[in-house]
Amino acid sequence: MGAYKPHRWVPVFLAAALFLTMGQPTAAQDVIPLFPIGGTNASSGICVIDIESGKTVAACQAEQFFVPASTQKLITAATLLMCHRPDWQLTTRVFYDGAVSKRGRLHGNLYIQGCGDPSLGSQYADTPPDRFIQEVAAAVKAAGITAISGGIVADDGAIPDNPVVSKWLWEDVGNYYAAGCYGINYADNRFAATFSTGEPDSRPTLLGITPEVEGLRFYYPYLSTNRSGRDSAYIYGGPYEYTRRVFGSLPAHREQFTIKGDLPDPPHFLASQLTDALRKAGIKVHDEATTARRLHESGLTLPDYETDGHLLFLHTSPTLAEMLRHTLTQSDNLYAEALLRQVELAVAPTATLAGSIEEMKTIWREAGFSIDDATLYDGSGLSPLNRITPLMMGQLLAHVARSGQGGDLLPELLPQPGEGTLKRFMAGSTLSPALHLKSGSMTGVQCYAGYYTGKRSYAVVVMVNHFSGTRASVQKEIADMLTRVLTTLDNRQ
């Protein structure tokens, strides 16, 4: 793993700092003065690769290791496109076992067989969030089932792993953007807590939690209000823990202010929601909802319902292209983590984080390109311990764009300036129509990676770590530098 090496830039070395391999050597002088980015203690790296030739045409600190933040989602997305067609979909199936009596009583259980689909019940899918539950309830009625002597079992065994990444920061775990990844993900694995706030330095009042989560306890004795108008509240709590604690502060004088956290057990939440929906529809369900994990912890095992039971309902996700488009445009960590697990699930019945990362590296080795030297702890880039070089990222992007295995679609799945997480970045630039970038940011980190499709097509990577000053100022420095580099390259054609 590469360590940070903050550098001081001395004029005599600038000629070697950033080079353009096209045209006259003096052309580099047009770009060099824009470095360093982010202050004297920052580490800055850039790599621009001509996709057709595979040659590096501009580089600076390109072989230094950086924290990529959310640009790491590009590795996950590119890997999925190497594995599956853009129209590939995930499938969640519902089975029942036992016999149905003449009076409509099912002497058995319903089983939701999960596959880790992040779009199930998601507010970002094109269907209503409760559509899955309503369709299963309709399928139960259509099968003539009026009562269930057992209950609803959520089979979350496809991902028998710690739902959250051990290398994530503790202050992130429990918040919506660090939601765990389960064998069954539902409703984006999140809830919303709404408060009202009064005078600064007073204690907010909890108005409610949506959706209601049975057993969830919310403690916030140290949550206060502030004058700044900023949301500085963090929710703490791990997977399967039904106690959530909130620290920090919320803006003062708000009738309603909402913060979001992650569900403690999404598979159980879905099974409970379906149980409630069936009961409201007049279908009696005897047992309370449970999951494969809970049964296993009680010393019980699931029957072979897939072989001995009956398929009741089949739900398909949006296409891979649609899910990746959302993942990259909105920088959705849950989608990225769930899709990473699909890499191993394509070759094995279950998936773990470590196994999925290793399978991802195997896929790239077999494709003739190695990412073995990268330090990867997740699929979303949320871990601050991830490390990759701009050169490695750029070569990967160029490789997948030339692969003909769906990689040529990747630029179309990326946001352009003015969209998603690029809403304000280079939005008014004349280069904007040709830029397709994924941003990545965390404390002291600002990165961009993707494609520029101007007179020629390039893979573009910029990484800045340990910057000082405001994020807006660093983003402007990056925008100015990219404008100079890409304009120079365009003018060479």
Residue spans of the language-model regions?
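Bacterial N-terminal signal peptides that target proteins for export
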Residues: 2-13
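Short active-site loop at a secondary-structure junction
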Residues: 59-79
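Small-residue-rich helix-loop
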Residues: 57-59, 131, 337-493
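Conserved serine DD-peptidase/penicillin-binding transpeptidase domain
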Residues: 31-35, 82-371, 484-492
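Beta-lactamase-like hydrolase cores
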Residues: 26-65, 87-91, 134-144
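A short glycine/serine-rich beta->alpha loop
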Residues: 61-66, 260, 380-383
